[in-house]
Amino acid sequence: STRVRSSAASDVYKRQVAVGGKTAMEKSKKALLEGIKGSDIEIIDFVWYGGDSSYENVEKIKNNPSVQKADMVFGIGGGRAVDTAKTYCALYNKPLFTFPTIASNCASCTSLSVMYNPDGTFKEYSYHKAPAIHTFINTKIIAESPEKLMWAGIGDALSKEYEVIFACREKNMIHTPLLGKAIASASTEPLISFGKKALEDCKNNVPTEAIEQVALDIIITAGLVSNFTVHENNPNPEEDYYYNSSLAHCVYYGASLFPQCERQHLHGEIVSFGVLCLLTYDGQFEERNRIFEFNRSIGLPCTLGEIALTPDDVPAIAHKAASVVEWKYVPGNPTEDAFINAILATDKAGKEFLADK
């Protein structure tokens, strides 16, 4: 349910503004109004976030009169909508509550935002001091969301365990990231156990145990891992660490350079192919074969061609990968050539796997 009854929300903050996606706010408006009924909270406006998580849209939100009047913000929708609201609240010191309307990523529960340039290409991570005060998940709304978005969310969350455990290797682990690593180990199995059924139930718009388990995995488990495995903008840079993602997301950031991929394929869809590339790079071939099977079972990609890329695109992907923060924490001595070879080998193995089915 979406019941806002905490002292944090009603006793201190009275005027609330909703910032989010147009469809997301339309779908959740009734539940939100029902949720605040009987409290002192007033929703003074519903403000569109601008269509992408960019600093330009954050500035537009800042200049909105309703946002300026509000005591707090409800961030509503998918990852880019929530990341925009989150960045605004972090920069301008507004309390934030999040309401994910799709189970496509963990943005609602994390203390960082993925920011993009106005042309849609990846710009940077924006790090915040804390996540939202509270995240509300309404499984009925999630069940009525597009099945394809949950599908992509499964692909994104599929990366969590493999990337975190890989990135933590050869590191001097202290308590907080060690705890994040432990939580990450609980990420993969719920997706494999409940993922296919959850997609079927989402297609039929039926809130079920499978949808609840997958939504919790995508939004909460992955979000908690992120919060425990990232420490950036520290006064002592030598104490910084970033173990939250690794080579699977490196594939995504490189792929975002290619419009035919970035515009036609979802974040988690691309990341799921990146998981296979990471497992190839790390020599985990038995586990890679298990994920080949899982990806095929729900239609996630096993080859470059399925995400509108070719072998000729791979050097540019690897070059971009070497420029992002994840590359710094790849264990061993990573090289662009080694990553190129891993991606190409994954594509070759994926083609052979699909040909045998």
Regions found by a protein language model. Give the residues of each.
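C-terminal charged capping/lid subdomain of soluble metabolic enzymes
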Residues: 284-357
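N-terminal small/polar loop signature for handling phosphorylated ligands or for N-terminal nucleophile
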Residues: 27-97, 197-211
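Generic secondary-structure signature for well-ordered alpha-helical cores
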Residues: 37-41, 66, 120, 140-144, ...
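A glycine/threonine-rich phosphate-anchoring loop and its flanking beta-alpha core
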Residues: 90-187
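Single conserved hydrophobic/aromatic residue that forms the stacking wall/gate
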Residues: 2-9, 13
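Active-site segments that bind and position negatively charged phosphate/pyrophosphate groups
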Residues: 173-294
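Generic N-terminal targeting/processing segments that precede catalytic cores or assembly contacts
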Residues: 14-32
